[in-house]
């Protein structure tokens, strides 16, 4: 309900905190509260920012990462990215569909026995395939992922366990919750932010949340080093330096034979979102 309200009320000229306040009131009015401070920003490339002081402008994207905590203290964690105005621009639509396709592929891969680490790599490959179609990536996307090219655009993890804490049992340590004695948590940029890597099991509740984040300072750093230039066309990438970011997130429970998306249907295609604008 919070994200549906986001799609209905967000307009240019509103402040980020104005929208966030209206969304929080929905969670409280339903007898619960938010499961973490609402992330609502037109600077989606700033991961998990809690600053909400900006006036939203037409032509921008608004990223909302918000979940409710029920009276039984179970948490939700959902993200949608919408146009601040009525419609996505052409390039916003293209980038959005890249993320959506990656998310759909990742969700379809979620079933018992599959390493979530491998699903993360699958999503990253889909992201780079999409960017290759726009001339930003060169060569084979899967090989590029093997060289960690995706970490320039997808710096965080695909998802995490969720339960009575939004990052379930995180205080025990991510190595103990998201990994095993045989499967160690990564230590390199990007991979070290993947909270869950182990094989999925029936009953696991997880988030699936790929994104594209164009961080100007990070782009400049890689470009100055000519880092992985065999895979990255920095001249084409320059066109996207101020694009900001997109994330799409849903919550799944792993079943005996696959998965089930939790909650009622929440619009996430371009057509569905624009119909509510």
Regions found by a protein language model. Give the residues of each.
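Active-site neighborhoods and metal-handling regions in enzymes and metal-associated proteins
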Residues: 1-277
